[in-house]
């Protein structure tokens, strides 16, 4: 099935497993370069389903079977819009905000932690291994790849100028504070 985001410009490939709409619903959020087909999503999906939860698994934009804008991810900046669209879709089905939970792994965890900056229409967040300090994460990844870490600054500016992405906007601590949540 498909959920529309960004005024219908983005089609999010999704799986919906309905058990009982009066019970909690979990939105499963995958990691970078992954999809809803990932074991990091399929395993919890099976466990949540067996426990009677409703489940919505989405492919973020530029991932899996969803619309590919440019093949890049935006460190949660645009991916949070995908989650907001998924929440809206659930609410249109009659799911109460308090019954909606976000479960994210890696990038999905980061996106879950950043979602309160754009929506508070959900009741809980559970994350596995989210990168919460993006600047440190990028520097460590650059060092791991054998690149000089001083290149962080030009990359940061490039992302802002050419992609319109502010990688330090709505970092998890700030996003959670907007939703009166703590890390």
Label each region the model flagged.
Residues 2-7, 12-15, 163-183:
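Serine-hydrolase catalytic core
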Residues 23-31:
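Short beta-strand element of the alpha/beta-hydrolase
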Residues 32-47, 60:
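The serine-hydrolase catalytic nucleophile loop
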Residues 45-67:
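Conserved alpha/beta-hydrolase
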Residues 73-94:
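Alpha/beta-hydrolase active-site loop
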Residues 94-105:
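Alpha/beta-hydrolase fold nucleophile elbow
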Residues 104-108, 112:
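Gly/Ala-rich beta-loop-alpha elbow adjacent to hydrolase catalytic centers
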Residues 114-166:
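Hydrolase active-site cap/lid region
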């Amino acid at each position: 099935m498909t959920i529309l985001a960004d005024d219908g410009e983005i089609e999010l490939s999704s799986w919906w497993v309905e058990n009982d709409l009066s019970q909690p619903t979990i939105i499963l959020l995958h990691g970078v370069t992954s999809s809803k087909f990932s074991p990091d999503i399929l395993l919890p999906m099976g466990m949540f389903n067996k426990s009677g939860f409703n489940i919505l698994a989405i492919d973020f934009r530029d991932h899996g079977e969803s619309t590919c804008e440019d093949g890049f991810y935006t460190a949660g900046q645009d991916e949070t819009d995908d989650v907001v669209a998924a929440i809206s879709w659930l609410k249109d089905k009659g799911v109460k905000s308090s019954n909606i939970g976000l479960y994210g792994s890696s990038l999905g965890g980061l996106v879950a932690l950043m979602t309160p900056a754009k929506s508070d229409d959900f009741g809980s967040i559970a994350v596995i291994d989210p990168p919460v300090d993006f600047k440190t994460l990028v520097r460590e990844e650059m060092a791991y790849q054998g690149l000089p870490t001083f290149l962080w600054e030009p990359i940061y500016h490039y992302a802002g100028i050419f992609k319109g992405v502010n990688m330090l906007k709505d970092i998890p601590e700030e996003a959670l504070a907007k939703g009166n949540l703590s890390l």
